[in-house]
Amino acid sequence: MSAESFNISAIRENKLLARREVLVEVSHHKAPTPTRKDLREWVAKQLGVDVSSVFIRKIKTEYGIGKSVAEVHVYSDSKMARIIEPLYILARNLGEEGKKLLEEVKKKRSERREKKRKRKK
């Protein structure tokens, strides 16, 4: 993260969903777009929260400029995040744990489909 500089440009409180919606501007000249992991750790450190309650929704990089804007959701409780955030966002942010969660859900879905097919016959 030596050539990268992070800056929180906006914070919006969403009391209904018990989260803060944060916009982070990242300047990364002559460097690749920062990873979700690096961004999550930086936001958690800046806001004084646990990394498990920070979820990167999207990172939009402008071509050739070396500037990215990230949309981040910071929850008051990580359990609430697992209920609200879509499965693909959880999988992207949680790494190996997210992949296991995704596989588990896919397996359950396929089992339900099989049961439904058997009932039709």
Curated annotation (Swiss-Prot):
Cysteine pairs bridged by disulfides in the record: none
Stored Pfam families: Ribosomal_S24e
KW Ribonucleoprotein (keyword) present: yes
Alphabetically ordered keywords of this record: Ribonucleoprotein, Ribosomal protein
Keyword Ribosomal protein set for record: yes
SUPFAM superfamilies assigned to the protein according to its UniProt record, in alphabetical order: Ribosomal proteins S24e, L23 and L15e
Sample GO molecular function, one term: structural constituent of ribosome
One record GO biological process: translation
Highest taxon above the source species: Archaea
GO CC entries: ribonucleoprotein complex; ribosome
PANTHER family: 40S RIBOSOMAL PROTEIN S24
Family in the record: Belongs to the eukaryotic ribosomal protein eS24 family.
The protein's name in its UniProt record: Small ribosomal subunit protein eS24
Origin organism lineage: Archaea, Thermoproteota, Thermoprotei, Thermoproteales, Thermoproteaceae
